[in-house]
Amino acid sequence: MSDFAFFALEALIKCIIIIAIFASLAGLATYAERKVLAYFQRRIGPDMVGPFGLIQLVADMIKLFTKEDIIPSNSQKFIFAIAPLISAICAFVSLAAIPMLPEFTLFGRVIQPIVADINVALLFVIGTSGLCFYAVFLGGLASNNKWSILGAARGLVAIISYESVGALALIAIVMLVGSFSLVDINNYQSDGFFSWLIFKQPLAFVLFIIALFIETNRTPLCLTENDAEIVAGYGTEYSGLRWGMFFIGEYASMIAGAILVTLLFLGGFNSFWIIPGWIMMIVKSSFIFFWYFWARAAFPQLRPDQVMKMCYLILIPLAVLNLLITALAVLL
């Protein structure tokens, strides 16, 4: 087999594995979230279908995929139909440039656990994951429903504002490392616990986490949907499989965000003491992923004006200040 054929086959297998694993993890994450929220609220959560309620995932999937797929008669039907697909595709494409685990050897060949090791991987991931929200915006706009349009518009204002916060936080990381490659950023933190970038850029870490909550539409910073204000927001008119694709795209983006935080700030997949790197990657990413659930259970939903004031009056000035301090540190 030629090198090109092997490369193409390897990339195809990696893509299939990523889609299969992360689609499954997205479903498992819904079960985990329901259990965590139940614990916070002194409830039991899913426990009737299968051991510990685990088969509830299958029951929910069957219910979701067999529901009637309704397209409103007054909607922009083509855009309404493809928006969920765009959301899911963008979420999975962003995973292509994220190194998941340390490299390993298989049948005498070194395998990189990444589909595309590009030198601007950070830009690629931020760009493609950001497109997920524009699919949400298109879906809300095409629904021709006042709640959907209002949710999409609120979310668009927030994402444009908070992407600036996230970008400024990441520029500080790039200035320190000198590369947009996620592999290079991971290797920069390979000298032990105190080489993790969270110790050099604690403010950038906090800013990026906040921006990530906006990017993934998570409470307490979710403006696209709110039962008390705009019903289900952009998803008000969606049902069945199309709603499920938005759902899968959202949770895949959450998983990608947790992995990205681990790579950027928490030492990535470098080994720690006697703990292998792949175990460290899973543990740290799971810990960050848990924050989504904890924040939803612990904090109330903020009003849109509070979210925007926090962005422009607090977070952007802090991000600019952090960038200036980092620039001075690099120059000196």
Swiss-Prot record:
GO terms for cellular component: plasma membrane. It catalyses: a quinone + NADH + 5 H(+)(in) = a quinol + NAD(+) + 4 H(+)(out). Its EC number is 7.1.1.-. The chain crosses the membrane at residues 4-24, 44-64, 78-98, 120-140, 165-185, 194-214, 255-275, 279-299, 312-332. One of its GO terms (molecular function) is oxidoreductase activity, acting on NAD(P)H, quinone or similar compound as acceptor. Pfam families: NADHdh. It is found in: Cell inner membrane. Keywords: Cell inner membrane, Cell membrane, Membrane, NAD, Quinone, Translocase, Transmembrane, Transmembrane helix, Ubiquinone. GO terms for biological process: aerobic respiration. Coiled coil: none annotated. It is a multi-pass membrane protein. Belongs to the complex I subunit 1 family. NDH-1 is composed of 14 different subunits. Subunits NuoA, H, J, K, L, M, N constitute the membrane sector of the complex. HAMAP family: NDH1_NuoH. NDH-1 shuttles electrons from NADH, via FMN and iron-sulfur (Fe-S) centers, to quinones in the respiratory chain. The immediate electron acceptor for the enzyme in this species is believed to be ubiquinone. Couples the redox reaction to proton translocation (for every two electrons transferred, four hydrogen ions are translocated across the cytoplasmic membrane), and thus conserves the redox energy in a proton gradient. This subunit may bind ubiquinone. PANTHER family: NADH DEHYDROGENASE SUBUNIT 1 (PTHR11432), NADH-UBIQUINONE OXIDOREDUCTASE CHAIN 1 (PTHR11432:SF3). This is NADH-quinone oxidoreductase subunit H. It comes from Campylobacter jejuni subsp. jejuni serotype O:6 (strain 81116 / NCTC 11828). The lineage of its organism: Bacteria, Pseudomonadati, Campylobacterota, Epsilonproteobacteria, Campylobacterales.
